[in-house]
Regions:
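Conserved Nudix-box catalytic region and its N-terminal flanking loop in Nudix hydrolases
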Residues: 15-56
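Active-site segment of metal-dependent pyrophosphate-handling enzymes
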Residues: 55-90
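Nudix hydrolase/Nudix homology domain
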Residues: 26, 30, 75, 94-143
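Short, charged/polar surface micro-motifs in flexible loops or helix N-caps
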Residues: 11-16, 23-25, 41, 75-76, ...
Length: 143
């Protein structure tokens, strides 16, 4: 059975919420910036998985369900990407997974690395985030 992931592309004030993954060799893309989310458990829908993962990782639940945006199976695992508004200020989020979080600008998202205040250094963007950014930029060009 293929394990898929559900990811959240959350926007607040023209910036997008990112997670800096832990520096643990056993996880995919350690030390890279990516989106909050995670594995879809057996019998769980991707929509339920993204809600659960947000609660587990940042102790936050959206007031309205996130909207399915797109699915992609070109990476290491099939990904279901959801989008929505981050209605809580960054300071109200409680980071429980990962080593940093950040609201990144479009310019930062289009670069190869993003600064981590916690680590005090530039960290790379996960390849999966590049797929999401290409989709976002294509939609912005179409608008």
């Amino acid at each position: 059975m293929t394990i898929s992931v559900a990811l959240a592309m959350l926007q607040r004030d023209g910036r997008w919420l990112l997670q800096l993954r832990d520096d643990i060799d056993s996880i995919i893309y350690p030390g890279h910036w990516g989106l909050f989310g995670g594995h879809v458990e057996p019998g769980e829908s991707p929509a339920d998985a993204v809600q659960r993962e947000l609660m587990e990782e940042i102790s936050w639940a959206p007031s309205t369900p996130l909207q399915p945006w797109f699915s992609d199976d070109s990476g290491t695992r099939p990904a279901h990407v959801f989008r929505g508004a981050l209605t809580a200020p960054l300071e109200q989020l409680c980071l429980k997974e990962g080593q940093d979080l950040k609201l990144a600008s479009l310019e930062e998202l289009c670069s190869e690395t993003i600064w981590s205040d916690h680590c005090q250094e530039q960290r790379p963007i996960a390849p999966g985030l590049s797929i999401v950014m290409r989709r976002l930029l294509a939609e912005m060009d179409d608008a």
